[in-house]
């Protein structure tokens, strides 16, 4: 059971990190404020690093990882595109990122609870990704 919980939790963590990168990519080019841009770029890098660490653990278990659901990616891209056309790109970007972080924290926390027998390494990396999402949401609040 421990190995299955570990594998499942890592897959969800992988999908979450990829979704975070994609969400940041979806708004980054429209951000005008340099501080906000830098903040998002740093978080994107951190999401990539966590995703890479997750993939290393998945590879060691013989797994190729998990892509975010196509429907979720498509809906997020559509929402980003529509919101970014509404004006004040920095405020819209902060709003989208805040929403995305909230969804990420909720789903990753749910998976952490759902797979309690996952190895400590898998739980740790999931908690780190949750922490990154919480930190990013807090950091973009001044731009809302």
For the regions a language model picked out, list residue spans one by one.
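Amphipathic alpha-helical hairpins
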Residues: 1-144
């Amino acid at each position: 059971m421990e190995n299955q919980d570990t594998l499942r939790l890592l897959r969800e963590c992988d999908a979450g990190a990829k979704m975070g990168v994609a969400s940041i990519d979806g708004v980054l080019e429209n951000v005008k404020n340099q501080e906000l841009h830098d903040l998002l770029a740093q978080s994107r890098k951190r999401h990539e690093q966590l995703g890479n660490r997750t993939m290393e653990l998945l590879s060691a278990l013989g797994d190729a990882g998990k892509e975010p659901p196509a429907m979720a990616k498509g809906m997020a891209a559509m929402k980003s595109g529509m919101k970014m056309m509404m004006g004040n790109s920095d405020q819209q970007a902060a709003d989208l990122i805040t929403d995305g972080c909230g969804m990420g924290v909720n789903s990753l926390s749910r998976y952490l609870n759902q797979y309690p027998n996952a190895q400590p390494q898998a739980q740790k990396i999931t908690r780190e990704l949750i922490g990154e999402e919480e930190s990013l949401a807090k950091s973009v609040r001044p731009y809302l």
